[in-house]
Amino acid sequence: MAEQSIQHHPLLRRRDGHHARVTFEELFFDLVYVFAVTQLSHELLTNLNPTGVIETLILWFAVWLGWQYTCWVTNWFDPETPRIRGLIFAVMLAGLVMASAIPGAFGDRGWIFVLAYVALQVGRTAYIAWELGPDHPLAANYRRMLGWVSISAVLWIAGAFVEHEARMALWAVAILCEYVSPMFGFPLPGLGRSKTSDWTIEGGHLAERCQLFVIVALGETLLATGATMARAEVWDVPVLSALLATFLGTLAMWWLYFGTSSKDATAAITRSDDPGRIGAYFHYIHAILIGGVIATAVGNDLVLAHPHDPLKTAYVVILVAGPAIYLLGSAIYKKAVYGVVPASHMVGVAALVLLVPVAYAVDLLTMGWLTTIVLLFVGFREGRTLRKRTLSSAAQPASH
């Protein structure tokens, strides 16, 4: 494989100038992450305290990194070739075991979670590095990546065999290794560092994969809403009102992402002079944005299950933090796409913060409606901005 171009490796996607489609193998792979997101939201719901939040945050980043690194593989490599398809299915199995172990990851199933995660990250990266051989243009990047996921693996494994607080600390450092190292090009002594300009990704495909994960997270939110509704003993007016509030809140999140920016995001990464840099940036942002969706799903569950209950501090935090994190992630995302932080999102975050003292005077149902109204307001403002942007773009050709 010496001196071959990226285009000539038999396992790589063919770059013919057309948008690389998302394959059925990739969609099948994503089903594991529907389950993983469900597990995370349930874990947070049953451990709604500071320790539980930190634990869920660590586990969420592990889930996200496993998906993200695999996403980059399927951007470069063709999932319809037998060897890459087999790799995806092996990663799916490891991901399924990892997701199944989430409830006991900080207990007696920590070693199962770790072995599945390490097998997923190190095994996939080592296999790709082996397939590429020593001379392929992507080989050096994968050797550096393998070095960093191996360093992280040592921390993951060490964490599985120590007590709870030490485990949290070691796993948090392991997460940082894998999350931050791409920002600096996976630098390692003797191996150098990668440049984002060397990451010759198919931008439209990567944007679409991120968008599909947002759909996964929003879909899990609806599944949780439906499941909680089904368990309700009485479908009275407050319960039906809670259902409407949570549904409209989820709809507002969908609109803020897909209705106002998703097509422009695809265009931004496709037209960029450095799509690798923008693609990496998109992945960093989506970890925050989707984390907000997961937290919001937990808040929705509380509103539906206990509409008349007063708010404990933990309830206030989750009901405000979920939408606020989502809006912050969405604002950073739109900054990457348009170059400007949308004022509507910052107003929305401020409004959510101002609801904190109000929350202690109302019940869960009222608070659920108040946070939904904030999301709907931001969505309405963004809709107006989109219309102005569309009219401005349509008028530009006529002005020349």
Where are these predicted regions, by residue range?
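Predominantly late transmembrane helices and immediately cytosolic-facing juxtamembrane segments
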Residues: 2-27, 32-35, 47, 57-86, ...
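Alpha-helical transmembrane segments of multi-pass membrane proteins
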Residues: 32-42, 363
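Membrane-helix boundary connector in multi-pass membrane proteins
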Residues: 336-339, 355-368
